[in-house]
Regions:
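Bacterial N-terminal signal peptides that target proteins for export
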Residues: 1-5
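C-terminal motif of bacterial Sec signal peptides marking the signal peptidase cleavage site
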Residues: 12-16
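Surface-exposed edge beta-strand/loop patches
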Residues: 18-19, 152-196
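Bacterial Sec signal peptide processing site at the extreme N-terminus
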Residues: 19-29
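Extracytoplasmic low-complexity, Pro/Thr/Ser/Ala/Gly-rich segments
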Residues: 27-96, 196
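Hydrophobic core residues within well-ordered beta-strands of beta-rich domains
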Residues: 67, 99-101, 162
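Short, well-ordered beta-strand segments enriched in hydrophobic/aromatic residues
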Residues: 99-110
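The feature marks short-to-medium sequence segments in extracytoplasmic or secretory-pathway proteins
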Residues: 108-157
Length: 196
């Protein structure tokens, strides 16, 4: 029966529906892209491999938890990856290709946090300005070469890190332009431009 049901995948587009409301302290600013002036709180653009500032958990179970995200590598998949993933074709929205983002999640302080609570704010920005959240798979798991699904329920204590790979689906013909880390409604996202 599961083979006939197929996998149902939802790629959520970011349309301002981040429910974090984290209330983080720091300077709001106008989102200036100048990273040379001011403190590290104002820096918005990073190189792949560069750690984010500490982020506060938006989950009630770990509300005092703080963590960092370090996107390290971005790779665009192929049509064959998509065909072999186990996902049904989405004829309504056109063909998609996967983009894989490897990141290191590091729990810095506070209550133990689940891996899924630390990577759920990652966003893929395309060269056309489109933004897509990570692929959420229901009723079966998608399979990607060299990008295993992370154990989202694994808990990390302060000082522990986990290397994860996250898959995003973007329209075929578009390119990955940047990995973004959403910081809620009122703060500009952090960005790691893709240079390849």
């Amino acid at each position: 029966m599961p083979a006939t049901v197929g996998a149902l995948a939802l790629a959520l587009a970011v349309t301002g529906c981040d429910d974090s409301g984290s209330g983080k302290r720091g300077k709001g600013g106008s989102g200036s892209h100048s990273s040379a002036s001011g403190g590290s709180d104002e820096k918005k653009t990073y190189r792949l491999g560069e750690e984010s500032p500490e982020q506060e958990s938006s989950k009630t179970t770990s509300k005092d938890g703080k963590y960092t995200v370090t996107p390290t590598k971005v790779e665009t998949g192929t049509k064959a990856d998509m065909e072999n993933s186990g996902l049904k074709k989405d004829d309504k929205n056109g063909p998609k290709i996967p983009v894989y983002v490897w990141s290191t999640l590091t729990h810095k302080s506070g209550t133990a946090m689940e891996v899924g609570d630390m990577d759920d704010k990652l966003v893929m920005k395309t060269n056309t300005g489109g933004r897509t959240r990570a692929l959420i798979v229901l009723m079966g798991a998608a399979k990607w070469p060299n990008c295993p699904e992370p154990d989202s329920s694994k808990k990390l204590s302060p000082g522990q890190s986990e290397k994860v790979c996250t898959a995003f689906l973007i329209p075929e013909g578009q390119k990955a332009a940047a990995v973004e880390l959403s910081q809620g409604y009122y703060k500009a996202p952090l960005e790691w431009p893709v240079t390849n």
